[in-house]
């Protein structure tokens, strides 16, 4: 059973929010669905009164306007749960990080030395060190960035690595309950609680 936060629709708004409690990304009605993995999942919320329900596992794309260039960027979110009643999308931070996407959720005003990569999502574009940085905003304590539903034509004409980037991987199968995550973390901690150096 997957766990996601409950989220109501807010007319006229579309955005993608970071959700540290969601073990899998969730796409709402303002994402363009491009693939059905035919792998339904049982989803539960945080309230005991919420009945678990079966939802589809899909791949989808959201659009984002890069404020530094004004260009439209398309972000593929693979192996996500489709919840069409939701206006916004939820981004499971762990799932993004497993695709080597850097997520910094510390607000800039809380950082001792903020940079462009503070409170931002950063995607490495190639081996020359160039990056796409998506700055995050706050509503209350929720980190988010504005997104929109792209047209089929815009998605099909976008060139991967130039206008299209993947926030999560399409394969292997995403399993948020995989014990390897806990084992890998345990192997990085000494019995005294200190971190194990990488070259130890």
Where are these regions (language model features)?
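Accessible peptide chain termini
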Residues: 1-2, 200
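Aspartyl protease active-site motif detector
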Residues: 2-47, 78-92
């Amino acid at each position: 059973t997957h766990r996601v936060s409950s989220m109501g629709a807010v007319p006229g708004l579309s955005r993608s929010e970071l959700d540290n409690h969601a073990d899998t990304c969730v796409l709402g009605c303002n994402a363009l669905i491009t693939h059905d993995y035919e792998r339904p999942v049982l989803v539960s919320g945080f309230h005991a009164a919420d009945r678990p329900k079966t939802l589809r596992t899909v791949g989808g794309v959201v659009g984002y306007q890069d404020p530094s260039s004004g260009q439209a960027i398309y972000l593929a979110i693979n192996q996500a749960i489709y919840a069409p009643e939701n206006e916004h999308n939820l981004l499971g931070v762990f799932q993004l990080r497993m695709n080597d996407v850097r997520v910094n959720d510390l607000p800039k005003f809380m950082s001792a030395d903020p940079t462009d990569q503070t409170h931002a999502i950063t995607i490495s574009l190639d081996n020359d060190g160039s990056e796409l940085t998506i700055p995050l905003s706050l509503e209350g304590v929720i980190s988010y960035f504005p997104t929109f539903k792209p047209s089929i034509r815009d998605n099909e004409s976008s060139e991967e690595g130039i206008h299209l980037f993947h926030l999560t991987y399409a394969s292997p199968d995403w399993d948020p309950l995989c014990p390897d995550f806990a084992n890998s973390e345990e192997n990085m901690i000494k019995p005294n609680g200190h971190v194990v150096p990488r070259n130890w």
